[in-house]
């Protein structure tokens, strides 16, 4: 007799860290993201993070989605949404850095944001913002009307 084994995914949840941190503005989100970006690599390598929030906009968790070269990073929408579903997030805020120091969103930044927004809407998860960080400043897509 032959059995097919199906791998099991196990989720573990622990309330610690930023779990009571309320994110009510782009500035609040940037403050949380800056705690997780590597300051020594902010001007060297591009990284992409997702911040997951509950219905009260309290932090459920943060996840590094990718880290790559000096001018781009690979972002898989499925990975962002998978984590949102696993932690029962009601909202997501994205952030990535521009090692160049330029805060202007690229065409690719706008395109991936729209892809993530479409996926999040389908899953009834709100994409609240996408922030671009540099070592000296930040830009909020929501504040600039890009969302």
List each language-model region with its residue ranges.
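Active-site-proximal loop/helix of nucleotide/amide-processing enzymes and allied scaffolds
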Residues: 1-15, 31, 54-56, 71-147
């Amino acid at each position: 007799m032959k059995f097919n084994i199906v791998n099991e995914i196990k989720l573990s949840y622990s309330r610690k860290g930023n779990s009571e941190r309320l994110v009510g503005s782009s500035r609040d989100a940037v403050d949380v993201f800056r705690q997780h970006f590597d300051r020594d690599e902010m001007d060297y390598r591009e990284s992409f993070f997702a911040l997951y929030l509950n219905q009260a906009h309290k932090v459920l968790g943060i996840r590094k989605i990718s880290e790559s070269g000096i001018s781009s990073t690979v972002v898989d929408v499925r990975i962002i949404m998978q984590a949102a579903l696993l932690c029962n997030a009601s909202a997501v805020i994205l952030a990535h850095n521009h090692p160049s120091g330029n805060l202007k969103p690229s065409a690719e930044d706008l395109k991936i944001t729209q892809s993530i927004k479409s996926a999040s809407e389908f899953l009834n998860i709100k994409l609240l913002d996408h922030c671009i960080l540099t070592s000296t400043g930040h830009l909020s897509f929501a504040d600039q009307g890009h969302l």
